[in-house]
Each structure stands twice: as structure tokens, then as C-alpha cells.
Design a protein with these regions (language model features):
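Substrate/ligand-engaging "lid" and interaction regions
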Residues: 4-511
Length: 511
């Protein structure tokens, strides 16, 4: 008779260094943040680099806030198992790896002295972080340079760099390379701006400011990997299969991309030499300008999501994988990507098409359940950020409307069509209707108010009201773009009369 999970846990050894055969390594990387993303992305990258090259660097994790505990890390000597699951070249792929790159985990508050000791060590060279979009902020209330530690992440970092500067008397070779992973524009530049403000606020000497400016490098980065995290439903089965208990199991997709931009203090060749990721065979791009790669990601990956998910949902699909197995929606997505988005991008066609191929594999990943309704959140602002640049770029380049991006506007308007408000999770949503089934329309109040007041009008009036609302399109009046208003009006009329499935089927057959 099989043992119950509780009995297995009692009889099972917890994952530790004796199981992983981890090698002791000098700490070269300090990582602010202990979450699933960094462990499945950055720590994985350094783990593979240790295996494939002579980098030989350990990571020390820093818990930057009071909330949470590092008990599980200490119980497992910072060892954990990572599962990468996805589609590669149209085939399922799964990789299971014991991650040994993390050598310690400390709390910036409770373990302050040890944290500072790591931050001022001879071997430290890199700092990575993922403190969320709200983490890289300047707060003048964080005004005590002697706090143990300061409250904000940039405040902590300013103090740490200052202690490092003091310990090594401003030595040029003791500067650090900072690689923030926060999802904000120009994250490295913004982090440096915050530190400069704290230097001013705290009245720190000019010598320190010069040292930061000359010998520390703040590299803007772009990260891309979907990380579902701890597999709660499968954990017991996995531990039984592996023969050890692991409370830090992490899961992510196979695809991963890190784009790292060098700064003025750090020649590109030196950055590539110090971080031998390419030698390790990893998908990391070192560049003098990360913006074209961000543009590619936003317009191809995020833009394709936004362009097809609402039409796909109204046509009867519920997640991305189903959508990709629907031949009509698959064609819709591929036509949008290859014929309407990629021609407007600054990177080479070959580079963009290779990325698009990987995106399609990611959309086919059966291990990640991308619910279309979840993706639909705030679709109006998403369309502006992700699809509008491609739409306008196409119109400018070819002097005609992009067929599928144009239809995506009509699909969005149809998805948002509702005059019924309801309370949900303490807020207000609109209630849409898909073939008799209600769904929530979630967006900012101003957006919901607009659709509540206008979506019940005639197709012509509704279309003009939406396209001429410059707040939705970055100041642009789309009602003046070629014959867009007439085309959208026809689409809205057709969708109302025949339904999304019939209209989108005809759209694909027209090619």
C-alpha cells in the first residue's frame, strides 16, 4: 500500500548539499530578492555558467524587506530543484536541474551585519535585483544614512556602496556592476538616478559620488521568462519521484532571454568577458542599446497577445494553447506577426522572425495555462502601448490599413460592449456576454464608463466615439486615419449580426 505524503516526508531526506554535491564558491553576486523569478532566471543562468565556464561565482540572496522568512533556504542549504517545461521547435521539452549557485541567504534587516559583510567582500562584483516595479523609487523620507538598513531598495544600495567605498578607500577595482531586472523602462538608469539623489539627500562626499560615477556600472536590462513558480499540486509527486523533499521547487518555461546593455564605464567586450554567458550557451544578448530588443518583445510577444486574445475569446476559446490549436486564430496571430508587426520593427527581419518562432512555441506550451480573460485585463491601455506603434508604423510605411491589427480594434470594442455594471473584488466591472455566458470586463473606471455610455449606440456612432477619443491612443485621433472608421464600423455591424466566430472565420478565408 503506497505511503501517504505525510509519511513520505517523515521518511525522506530534505534536499541539501550532500545530495546536490554543491561546490563551495566565492560570492561574486549579491541578489536582492528571493522570489521565484530570480531563482528560475538569474540563479539558473549563473548555475549553468558555473558548470560550463571557469566563472566560479556564488550568489548570496538578500531578503530586502521585513516580510517573509528564509527558513526554507537555510533548511536546504539554499539548494533547490528547477523544472523548465515548454515547447522547443514544436516539440515538448522538459529539463529538471538542481540549482547550486546560491551559497547563502541573508535578511537585510535581521542579518544586517552579515549582509554588509557580503556587500563589502573582496570577491563581490555583481548586484542583481527584482524588487518589483515599485522597488526602484526615491523617497526623501528615507533620510537616515545610518539606518540598519534604510527602507527603500535604492537607499539600501546607496548605503552598501558607501560602506564598500569606505572599506576599500575608493579603489577603482572595487566598483560593482549592477544588473536590475525590475520591469521598468531603463531600469539601470533609473536606479542610478535614485542613488545620486540619496547621495545628495544624505550629504555624502563628492569623492563617493565620483567613485559611483566612474567605477560602478548600471546596466539597463530586459528579462523574459514566464515563471509559474512552486508546483503546489505536483510537489508531493515530484519529491516522491526524486527521492528527497524540496520545499523550494521552482517551475518556469524553457524559453528565457536576458538582454544586458553596457554603460559608459564598461566596454561591451569587458562585460561579455566578465559574464561568460555566451560561452555557456545561454540566450543572453549583450548590446550597446537594449531598446530595439524591448520594442521587439513588446510588439511581438505582448502585442500578439493583445491583438488576438479578445477575438479568440469571443470566438469560443478560453486559453492561449486552445487559441493556437484553433486554425483560424492561429492564422490570425501569424498573419499579424509576420506581415503587420515585424515589417515595422528596427531589428533585422531574420532576428524578428526567429523571435516570433520562439513566441509561437511559447504560446503552444501546454504547461502554462494562459487564460484569455486574465490577459484581457486593461486591454485598452495595452493596445495603445503594444499594438498602436505597429499599426501606425504599418500605415506610414505602406499607406494602407493592416488587416488584422485593424480587426483587433473591432474585436476589442466588441469584447468591451456592455451597459451592465457589477461589483467584483471590491471594485466595479462591466458584464460582457459571450453566447449567453457572462464574463467580467476589467479596466480603469474611465474606460469602463466610456464603454457603458457608448457601446450601446449604433456601430457608426460607437466607432467614431472610440476612434476619436485621443486618450485611448496616445493623443492620436484614429478616426482620421485613412478609411479606418468605415472599416471598423462594418466589422462591428457584422460581429453584432453574425457573431465573432463567423466573422473571424471569413476574415481568415479572405486571404
Amino acid at each position: 500500500m503506497p505511503l501517504k505524503w505525510a509519511e513520505w516526508r517523515n521518511n525522506m531526506q530534505r534536499l541539501n548539499k550532500s545530495i546536490t554535491h554543491a561546490v563551495d564558491r566565492p560570492v561574486k553576486v549579491m541578489q536582492f530578492g528571493e522570489g521565484n523569478f530570480l531563482r528560475a532566471f538569474v540563479d539558473y543562468i549563473f548555475d549553468v555558467t558555473n558548470e560550463k565556464t571557469d566563472f566560479n561565482g556564488g550568489v548570496v540572496i538578500v531578503k530586502p524587506i521585513e516580510f517573509g522568512t528564509l527558513e526554507r533556504f537555510h533548511d536546504q542549504e539554499c539548494q533547490y530543484t528547477l523544472q523548465l517545461r515548454g515547447f522547443v521547435d514544436g516539440q515538448p521539452k522538459e529539463i529538471t536541474r538542481q540549482i547550486t549557485s546560491v551559497v547563502d541567504a541573508v535578511a537585510a534587516i535581521e542579518d544586517y551585519d552579515k549582509y554588509i559583510e557580503y556587500g563589502t567582500s573582496e570577491t563581490l562584483r555583481f548586484i542583481v535585483s527584482n524588487t518589483t516595479e515599485a522597488g526602484i523609487v526615491y523617497d526623501e523620507a528615507d533620510n537616515d544614512p545610518n539606518a540598519r538598513p534604510p527602507k527603500t531598495y535604492p537607499g539600501k544600495l546607496t548605503q552598501l556602496l558607501y560602506k564598500r567605498y569606505q572599506k576599500f578607500n575608493g579603489a577603482a577595482d572595487k566598483g560593482l556592476i549592477l544588473l536590475p531586472c525590475e520591469l521598468i523602462a531603463d531600469n539601470g538608469i533609473e536606479l542610478k538616478k535614485c542613488i545620486m539623489k540619496f547621495i545628495e539627500l544624505w550629504g555624502l562626499e563628492d569623492g563617493f559620488k565620483d567613485w559611483v560615477n566612474k567605477y560602478c556600472s548600471f546596466c539597463p536590462t530586459l528579462v523574459d521568462r514566464i515563471v509559474p513558480g512552486y508546483p503546489r499540486e505536483d510537489a508531493a509527486k515530484l519529491c516522491e519521484e526524486w527521492g528527497y523533499e524540496d520545499q523550494l521547487i521552482d517551475r518556469a518555461e524553457v524559453f528565457g532571454l536576458w538582454v544586458v546593455e553596457s554603460d559608459s564605464n564598461l566596454p561591451l567586450e569587458q562585460l561579455e568577458k566578465e559574464l561568460p554567458f555566451k560561452e555557456a550557451g545561454l540566450n543572453v544578448v549583450f548590446t550597446k542599446d537594449h531598446h530595439p530588443y524591448k520594442e521587439r518583445k513588446v510588439r511581438i510577444l505582448n502585442g500578439s497577445h493583445t491583438s488576438f486574445v479578445l477575438a479568440s475569446f469571443l470566438a469560443g476559446n478560453d486559453n492561449v494553447e486552445n487559441s493556437m490549436k484553433d486554425p483560424v486564430i492561429r492564422k490570425y496571430m501569424e498573419e499579424t506577426l509576420y506581415n503587420e508587426v515585424i515589417p515595422t520593427l528596427s531589428l533585422s527581419k531574420e532576428d524578428c522572425e526567429e523571435f516570433a518562432k520562439a513566441v509561437i512555441d511559447r504560446f503552444l506550451n501546454p504547461f502554462v495555462d494562459h487564460r484569455l480573460l486574465s490577459i484581457s485585463l486593461n486591454s485598452v491601455s495595452k493596445w495603445e502601448a503594444r499594438c498602436l506603434p505597429s499599426f501606425l508604423g504599418y500605415v506610414k510605411k505602406f499607406n494602407k490599413l493592416p488587416k488584422y491589427l485593424t480587426f483587433s480594434i473591432a474585436a476589442l470594442m466588441s469584447f468591451y460592449t456592455s451597459q451592465t455594471e457589477a461589483e467584483f473584488n471590491g471594485g466595479i466591472v462591466l458584464k460582457g456576454n459571450r453566447n449567453g455566458e457572462e464574463y467580467n470586463i476589467t479596466d480603469d473606471k474611465a474606460v469602463l464608463d466610456f464603454f457603458r455610455d457608448n457601446s450601446g449606440k449604433s456601430p457608426k456612432e460607437f466607432t467614431h466615439a472610440y476612434l476619436s477619443n485621443t486618450k485611448f491612443f496616445g493623443g492620436e485621433d484614429l478616426s482620421k486615419v485613412l478609411d479606418l472608421e468605415e472599416v471598423i464600423t462594418e466589422y462591428i455591424t457584422d460581429i453584432r449580426e453574425r457573431g465573432m466566430r463567423a466573422v473571424v472565420n471569413d476574415l481568415a478565408l479572405d486571404d
